């Protein structure tokens, strides 16, 4: 055996050739160890016999444990099985990219013809499946029972022409004995790379069942290769369940080809226009019959980075999943993270738009983090791709859902059929922070069909902080049902992001109705928004109605621009208290003035008959923040209710 000199062993009964280059590597105990590369060539498209893929796998499996193999293809075309292939039981690189003429799309198809799909069994850890179309299997197209397996460049559920040829089960199934796999590959973090296309299968596209530490990047799941047409899987696009932990769907890397710089922010916060970048490691998960991505079954620590869910590949048109875009159910400590650059206006996002259910549903799940995402907005930040229901729904007993963060970790939830955000049932510890609800990020109106945010939850300890809720069909913010324990401070509702021009909601800036009680509007939280500003709306700045009671409104501007100097009035008046509302307070004696209610078309404050025991105290009504006249067009206060207290207001 000569160092550096390959030699060949012909094995006529099994395959065309096995090439074994032997290279001296190191002397150990007076001998030499050699790195051995075992390559088998597939030379025909038959289901079995000499030169077939079946014969190659049988040879691999007959080898001693610990050896690695490569199966190359000297042919292209369709292998139609007559019986199921044996599982792969040794580390094997099945390299259909080696087929002559390969240029980025599969040239070899494994038509399972109703037989079992391809399975990587125990003993095959470290295997690779490259550039193969796997279709028409009974059950799953590809099953991973071993770890550290790479899938790249494959069609799973499509034929060589990219047409539906679905496997009857899941496209790719990763079992609890398999972990740390690469489903998709894009090491250069290059824009436009399509790794695997997993579409047209009878059940889910990709299932992680008790599997952890996997990375899923640059795949098309539920669409054609171009990401322009639906070839949906029969279930979800991706299902992560049964204690599947710490999987990353997508990624945050980005390389600017013009500079070669990775993750290149555009400058310091506030000095450069935000840049919106299509995330190259993200997956397109669209067109599936059920939900786009499901995280369930106590799975934890999973992260979605930079995926487009429910849109075409460019993120600007709908190619919706039949259910929710993302559904997190009974699975805590998971996250959708679009952006990690806190100090730069580099905006990097998941786009979860165009779906037939909600964009995101968080149900009975705790500590979910949602930062830097678009729900209902297109990737271009200038048009809408509506989710049919809410942008975000938080329900059940979900605790501590964090939607947003410091700039630029906020979200856009705009253009959706119902609400931008809805929080219901007993959800508690919820926060929306730096959300654009009803408008594009730093831009114009993109109305949600109902409210910017609707909270009916009885769970308490929910916070609406530093949001712009403007441009919605109905209200900017609504607290309804038995909502309690909600703090709203500080926000803009009815104006643009800078708070200096009108961007009206079709209803009220803030509506408190139903039996909502014990909520606080205003406070001492400060950020780029100095206080609540409810101005420019087509009805009232603040309306309290129904049987709402024990709600406090203070430290808010109602009818002015954000600095409280000039008028940007609400169309019907500043504050309306109606129905049977009781024991509510517009103002208190902690701050002077408590509220600024000025510049509105209509009366400053109206209390209709049927209301009782409400207080309007210590406010500027018809004056700006400096105490100078800024009148409402009607009288300062009209009180038609019973035992309402009007006291110490400056008019």
Predicted regions and their residues:
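Bacterial N-terminal signal peptides that target proteins for export
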Residues: 1-11
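N-terminal, post-signal-peptide segments of secreted/periplasmic proteins
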Residues: 26-147, 152, 158-169, 173, ...
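Beta-solenoid repeat scaffold
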Residues: 82-109, 150-157, 161, 181-192, ...
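Extracellular beta-strand-rich solenoid/capping regions of secreted or surface-exposed proteins
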Residues: 58, 80-93, 107-128, 135-148, ...
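Bacterial N-terminal signal peptides
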Residues: 11-21
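Parallel beta-helix/beta-solenoid
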Residues: 89-90, 123-124, 129, 146-147, ...
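Consensus positions within tandem repeat domains that build extended binding/scaffold surfaces
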Residues: 170, 203-204, 236, 290-291, ...
């Amino acid at each position: 055996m000569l160092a550096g000199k390959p030699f060949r062993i012909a094995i006529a009964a099994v395959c065309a050739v096995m090439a074994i280059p032997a290279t001296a590597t190191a002397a150990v105990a007076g001998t030499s160890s050699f790195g051995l590369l075992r390559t088998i060539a597939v030379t025909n498209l038959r289901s079995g016999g000499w030169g077939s893929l079946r014969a190659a796998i049988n040879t691999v499996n007959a080898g001693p444990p610990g050896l690695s193999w490569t199966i190359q293809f000297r042919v292209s075309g369709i292998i139609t099985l007559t019986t199921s292939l044996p599982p792969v039981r040794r580390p094997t690189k099945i390299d259909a990219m080696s087929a002559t003429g390969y240029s980025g799309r599969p040239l070899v198809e494994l038509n399972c013809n109703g037989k079992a799909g391809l399975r990587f069994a125990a003993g095959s850890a470290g295997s690779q499946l490259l550039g193969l179309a796997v279709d028409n299997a009974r059950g799953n197209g590809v099953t991973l029972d071993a770890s550290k397996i790479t899938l790249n460049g494959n069609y799973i559920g499509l034929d060589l022409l990219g047409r539906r040829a679905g496997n009857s089960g899941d496209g790719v199934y990763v079992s609890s004995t398999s972990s740390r796999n690469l489903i998709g590959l894009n090491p250069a973090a290059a824009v436009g790379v399509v790794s695997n296309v997993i579409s047209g299968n009878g059940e889910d596209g990709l299932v992680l069942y008790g599997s952890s530490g996997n990375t899923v990047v640059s795949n098309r799941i539920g669409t054609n290769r171009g990401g322009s047409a639906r070839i949906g899987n029969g279930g979800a696009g991706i299902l992560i369940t049964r204690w599947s932990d710490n999987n990353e769907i997508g990624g945050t890397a980005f390389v600017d080809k013009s500079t070669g710089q990775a993750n290149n922010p555009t400058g310091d916060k506030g000095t450069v226009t935000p840049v919106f970048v299509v995330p190259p490691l993200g997956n397109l998960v669209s067109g599936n019959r059920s939900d786009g991505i499901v995280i369930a079954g106590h799975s934890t620590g999973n992260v979605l980075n930079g995926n487009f869910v429910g849109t075409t590949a460019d993120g600007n048109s709908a190619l919706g999943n039949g259910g929710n875009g993302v559904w997190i159910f009974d699975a805590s400590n998971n996250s959708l993270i679009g952006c990690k650059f806190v100090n730069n206006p580099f905006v990097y996002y998941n786009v979860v738009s165009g779906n037939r259910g909600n964009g995101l549903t968080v149900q009975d799940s705790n500590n979910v983090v949602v930062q830097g995402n678009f729900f209902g907005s297109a990737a271009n930040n200038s048009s809408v791709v509506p989710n049919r229901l809410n942008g975000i729904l938080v329900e059940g007993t979900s605790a501590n859902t964090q939607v947003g963060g410091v700039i630029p970790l906020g979200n856009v939830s705009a253009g959706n059929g119902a609400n931008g955000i809805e929080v219901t049932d007993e959800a508690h510890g919820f926060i929306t922070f730096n959300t654009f609800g009803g408008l594009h990020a730093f831009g114009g109106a993109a109305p949600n069909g109902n409210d910017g945010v609707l909270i009916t939850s009885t769970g308490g300890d929910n916070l609406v902080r530093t949001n712009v809720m403007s441009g919605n069909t109905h209200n900017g913010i609504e607290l309804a049902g038995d909502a309690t324990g909600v703090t709203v401070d500080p926000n803009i509702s009815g104006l643009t992001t800078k708070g200096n021009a009108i961007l009206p909601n079709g209803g009220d800036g803030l509506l408190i109705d139903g039996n909502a009680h014990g909520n606080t509007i205003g406070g001492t939280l400060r950020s780029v928004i100095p206080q609540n500003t409810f101005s420019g709306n087509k009805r009232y700045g603040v309306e309290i109605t129904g049987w709402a009671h024990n709600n406090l409104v203070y430290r808010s501007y109602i009818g002015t621009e954000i600095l409280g100097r000039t008028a940007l009035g609400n169309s019907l008046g500043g504050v309306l208290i109606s129905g049977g509302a009781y024991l509510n307070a517009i103002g208190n004696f902690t701050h002077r003035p408590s509220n600024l209610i000025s510049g509105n078309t209509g009366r400053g404050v109206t209390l209709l008959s049927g209301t009782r025991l409400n207080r309007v105290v210590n406010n500027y009504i018809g004056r700006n923040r400096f105490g100078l006249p800024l009148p409402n067009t009607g009288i300062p206060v009209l009180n038609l209710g019973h035992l309402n207290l009007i006291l110490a207001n400056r008019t």
